Each structure stands twice: as structure tokens, then as C-alpha cells.
Regions:
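Gly/Ser/Thr-rich loops at beta-strand to alpha-helix junctions
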Residues: 8-15, 38
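Active-site-lining helix/loop region of Rossmann-like oxidoreductase modules
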Residues: 21-172
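Beta-strand-loop-alpha-helix segment that lines the small-molecule cofactor/substrate pocket
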Residues: 1-7
């Protein structure tokens, strides 16, 4: 007999690691998570979906506008099956379920990332001018019936020379 199992970055670093840390915590008030990735590593479709290379006005219309709606409108889009959440949207739901919590609300906000000087993108075959979107931060906030808030953010963008992939999580509570 043979068992083959597979897993990925989200499963380990956004899920199992956090639930293990939470299990060792006496009291949790808030879970804060942030993960960064370079859109240059994942191709043109991902770079464009993250708004890389757009002006801030274009970003607002093409990327952020879908999150600047009422909770009722968002729920209707979710119910229709047409909502396109960020990676963290599903992670928050998974963590809430894994921790035995109950969601009372969940929101997402896509915020453009910029840089103070021009950055070249090989993927987009362009120089992204200072102040244009290099990508985005998608911030997902989940409130639970039990009083625990999850605030997670995935940052996908064209990196400057000093930027790098990172995964940072904080559990606020006791111990802090």
C-alpha cells in the first residue's frame, strides 16, 4: 500500500502553522498575518490581476472597485458565484473553521502598492513609473462571534531590489 499526499505554501504557512500556534495560546484576541510574493515569479496573468503597471486611477477602476461595495452587494455577488476573492479570503475562512470559530462578517480591501522610483518588470516588459501600482495588498478582515478578529494580508507586487518573500504572523492575546 502507498499513500501519496500533497500540500502547498498556503496549507503549511497560512494554515497549519497558525492553527498550531493558536493551539498553544491561552487566549486569542486577534490573529494578524502577512505574506509577500513577487508577481514576477508567477507570470503575466498574476501580475495583471494584481494591478502591476496600472496608474492609481486605473487600479481603482480595474482592481479596487470590486471591493468598494456594500456588504449586501458583496454577499449577492458571493451567492451568485462571481466573487473573485484574494488568497487570504479563503485562508481566513479555513482558519476560522479549523479553530472552531463562527464568522459574523468578512471584508476585503485591495490597496495599490507603489514605489518611490521606477521599477522594471520583465514579466510586463515595461518600466513601472514612480507612483504607479507595482501590485497590491489584499487585506481581509474577519470578525467572529467569539470575539477573535483575523486580519490577514497578501502582498503581491513587482519587487524593488531590497524586497523579498516573507511570511509574518502575530497572535495577539495571552501570551502576547
Amino acid at each position: 500500500e502507498c499513500t501519496i499526499a500533497g500540500s502547498g505554501y498556503q496549507d503549511i504557512y497560512w494554515g497549519e502553522l497558525i492553527s498550531a500556534l493558536a493551539a498553544s495560546t491561552h487566549k486569542i484576541n486577534k490573529i494578524i498575518g502577512e505574506s509577500w510574493y513577487n508577481v514576477e515569479d508567477y507570470g503575466i496573468a498574476l501580475a495583471k490581476a494584481h494591478g502591476a503597471g496600472l496608474t492609481l486611477e486605473e487600479f481603482e477602476k480595474e482592481v479596487a472597485a470590486s471591493d468598494n461595495i456594500s456588504d449586501t452587494d458583496r454577499q449577492n455577488i458571493i451567492n451568485s458565484g462571481n466573487y473573485q476573492p484574494s488568497y487570504m479570503w479563503n485562508v481566513n475562512g479555513w482558519l476560522v473553521s479549523k479553530l472552531g470559530l463562527t464568522v459574523i462578517s468578512q471584508t476585503q480591501k485591495c490597496i495599490p502598492e507603489t514605489y518611490q522610483e521606477d521599477i522594471h518588470s520583465d514579466t510586463l516588459n515595461m518600466d513601472i513609473k514612480k507612483g504607479m501600482a507595482t501590485g497590491m495588498s489584499a487585506v481581509v478582515t474577519t470578525l467572529t462571534k467569539e470575539g477573535i478578529t483575523l486580519e490577514t494580508k497578501c502582498v503581491g507586487k513587482v519587487y524593488a531590489k531590497t524586497e523579498f518573500d516573507k511570511n509574518e504572523w502575530t497572535i495577539v492575546g495571552e501570551p502576547d
